[in-house]
Amino acid sequence: VIFNGLGNQMSQYAYYLAKKKVNPNTKVIFDIMSKHNHYGYDLERAFGIEVNKTLLIKVLQIIYVLSRKFRLFKSVGVRTIYEPLNYDYTPLLMQKGPWGINYYVGGWHSEKNFMNVPDEVKKAFMFREQPNEDRFNEWLQVIRGDNSSVSVHIRRGDYMNIEPTGYYQL
């Protein structure tokens, strides 16, 4: 399940790529009901990764929304599997999931979650040339020509709601 802003969506998509390698039947959905989607589905805008809009994906989205409201879906093999609260890598979650429909919900930020697909992740998150965006395309060529380029992603959400100082203490 993909939701939240660009940084989270990137980690979630990388996790999807890793799960798909383990189980080729794996599908990804965008949580259209999430209250935390800053600009909607950012992966298409930033990297050209389109949302799959097949009937199956639409049905999976509806089942996901309903399963969050009605627990009875568990009895027919619909499960929501959450990332551990401490965000630790859990190798067991990378195995093929139990029978039925399994929704994996979390940030999945540990690089260990997608170590089995490094090339696929790098390919997915390459910037593509943008039509009618001359300045962007000029910078893209500069970045591609420099072997020491660095990417910085500023987490907008971290600056929208500043937490009290105690929140940042260990």
Give a label for each model feature.
Residues 12-19:
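Short amphipathic alpha-helix
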